[in-house]
């Protein structure tokens, strides 16, 4: 029971630091919170890569899956920040930007998850 907990904690720590790094790199303010969008889009792509890779590696230790998906990608991506940012835009009277931000996160993440799966499938073919 200790190994899964450690795997998740280690992955989550690295993912959260990566998200923080993206927020610093993209900076605050501007048209839309680009760091949060980048974290969610990168996470969407990487979860697709992980899904397809795990399919090709059925004997992979479950601790790796926990570390990568539950831990790292759980720490990297952020639904709570996304929600807070969109609601703040609505409260500030910027419904168009709020809608665009929500569409970019949702549509972009779904597309990149699909692209991640297709990327691994193409490389494995």
UniProtKB/Swiss-Prot annotation:
Na(+) is not transported, but it plays an essential structural role and its presence is essential for fluoride channel function. It is found in: Cell inner membrane. One of its GO terms (molecular function) is metal ion binding. Keywords: Cell inner membrane, Cell membrane, Ion channel, Ion transport, Membrane, Metal-binding, Sodium, Transmembrane, Transmembrane helix, Transport. The chain crosses the membrane at residues 5-25, 37-57, 71-91, 97-117. It comes from the Bacteria. Na(+) binds at residues 74, 77. It catalyses: fluoride(in) = fluoride(out). One of its GO terms (cellular component) is plasma membrane. It is a multi-pass membrane protein. Coiled coil: none annotated. GO terms for biological process: cellular detoxification of fluoride. Pfam families: CRCB. Fluoride-specific ion channel. Important for reducing fluoride concentration in the cell, thus reducing its toxicity. PANTHER family: FLUORIDE EXPORT PROTEIN 1-RELATED. This is Fluoride-specific ion channel FluC. It comes from Variovorax paradoxus (strain S110).
């Amino acid at each position: 029971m200790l190994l899964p907990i450690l795997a998740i904690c280690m992955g989550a720590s690295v993912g959260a630091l990566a998200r923080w790094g993206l927020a610093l790199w993209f900076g605050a303010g501007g048209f839309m919170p680009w760091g949060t969008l980048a974290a969610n889009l990168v996470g969407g792509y990487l979860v697709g890569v992980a899904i397809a890779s795990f399919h090709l590696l059925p004997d992979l230790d479950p601790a790796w899956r926990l570390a990568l998906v539950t831990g790292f990608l759980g720490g990297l991506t952020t639904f709570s920040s996304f929600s807070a940012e969109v609601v703040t835009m609505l409260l500030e009277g910027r419904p168009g930007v709020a809608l665009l931000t929500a569409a970019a996160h949702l549509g972009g993440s779904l597309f990149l998850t699909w692209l991640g799966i297709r990327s691994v499938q193409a490389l494995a073919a």
